[in-house]
C-alpha cells in the first residue's frame, strides 16, 4: 500500500458520490471501499484528505446496477478513488446506470480478476483507467492478454520494454510503449479503450488532487 496526499472525497460532486454510495462505507472523514474475492476474502481501500491506501489483493471492488448482461461498458482501474475521480471529469458515463460497471482491481491486477469480469460482463466493451506510467500501460496489455486467454512476460532494460510472447521476443521503446503499440507488434486485437489523464498527471486521482 502507498500514501498519497489529496483533498479527499468531500471535493467530489454529490451526483458522482450518489452513484457509488451503496458500495462505500464512511467512517468519520474516511471513505472505505471493500474488495471481495470469489472465496469470500476481503480487503479495504482507504481514502481521506491526506491519505490513500490501496490493497494488493486478488478480489475486486465492483459497482453496477441491474443485470450484468445489460452492461455495455466495463471500466477497470487500480483503485476505487481513481474511478470516482474519472467520473468527476466524465459524469456523462453515469447518465445510464444499467449501462456501465466499474471494477477496481487493487495494486496488482491478476488473470483471475480478468477472467471473472469477462464472464460476468460478457456483453461489455472494456475501458481501462490504469496509471499513465509504464506500470499502468503494462497492465493495459496484461488485461488484453488475460481476456484472450494468453499471457506474456514484460521486462524493462534501459529504455526498452522487452516482451516475450508465444516464444517470440519483441522490443518497444519505453517512450512509445502502449497497448496499441503492443497489439500491433504481436498481432493481438482486444478492442479495449484506454483512458489516461491529460497533461503530465500519472492518474485520474492525481489529476483530481492537483487541479
Regions found by a protein language model. Name each.
Residues 54-68, 77, 81-106, 111-112:
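Catalytic phosphate/metal-binding cores of nucleic-acid and nucleotide-processing enzymes, i.e., regions
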Residues 4-9, 16, 90, 143-150:
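Hydrophobic, Leu/Ile/Phe/Ala-enriched alpha-helical segments that form helix-helix packing faces
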Residues 25-26, 66-71, 119-123:
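Flexible, charged surface loops at secondary-structure boundaries
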Residues 1-59, 210:
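Basic, glycine-enriched DNA-binding surface that flanks or lies within the catalytic cores of DNA
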Residues 95-211:
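TOPRIM fold recognition
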Residues 41-72, 98, 105, 130-134, ...:
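Hydrophobic, well-ordered secondary-structure segments
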Residues 72-78, 125-130:
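Short hydrophobic beta-strand segments
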Amino acid at each position: 500500500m502507498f500514501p498519497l496526499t489529496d483533498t479527499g472525497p468531500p471535493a467530489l460532486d454529490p451526483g458522482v458520490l450518489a452513484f457509488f454510495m451503496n458500495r462505500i462505507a464512511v467512517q468519520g472523514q474516511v471513505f472505505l471501499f471493500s474488495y471481495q474475492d470469489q472465496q469470500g476474502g476481503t480487503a479495504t481501500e482507504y481514502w481521506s484528505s491526506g491519505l490513500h491506501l490501496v490493497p494488493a489483493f486478488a478480489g475486486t471492488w465492483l459497482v453496477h446496477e441491474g443485470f450484468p448482461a445489460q452492461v455495455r461498458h466495463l471500466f477497470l482501474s487500480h483503485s476505487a478513488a481513481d474511478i470516482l475521480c474519472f467520473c468527476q471529469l466524465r459524469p456523462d458515463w453515469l447518465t445510464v446506470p444499467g449501462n456501465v460497471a466499474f471494477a477496481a482491481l487493487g495494486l496488482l491486477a491478476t488473470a483471475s480478476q480478468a477472467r471473472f469480469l469477462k464472464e460476468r460482463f460478457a456483453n461489455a466493451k472494456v475501458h481501462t483507467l490504469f496509471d499513465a506510467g509504464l506500470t499502468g500501460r503494462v497492465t493495459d496489455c496484461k488485461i488484453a492478454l488475460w481476456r484472450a486467454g494468453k499471457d506474456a512476460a514484460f521486462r524493462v532494460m534501459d529504455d526498452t520494454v522487452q516482451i516475450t510472447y508465444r516464444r517470440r521476443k519483441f522490443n518497444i521503446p519505453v517512450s512509445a510503449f502502449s497497448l496499441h503499440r503492443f497489439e500491433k507488434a504481436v498481432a493481438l486485437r482486444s478492442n479495449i479503450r484506454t483512458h489516461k489523464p491529460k497533461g503530465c498527471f500519472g492518474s485520474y486521482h492525481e489529476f483530481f488532487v492537483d487541479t
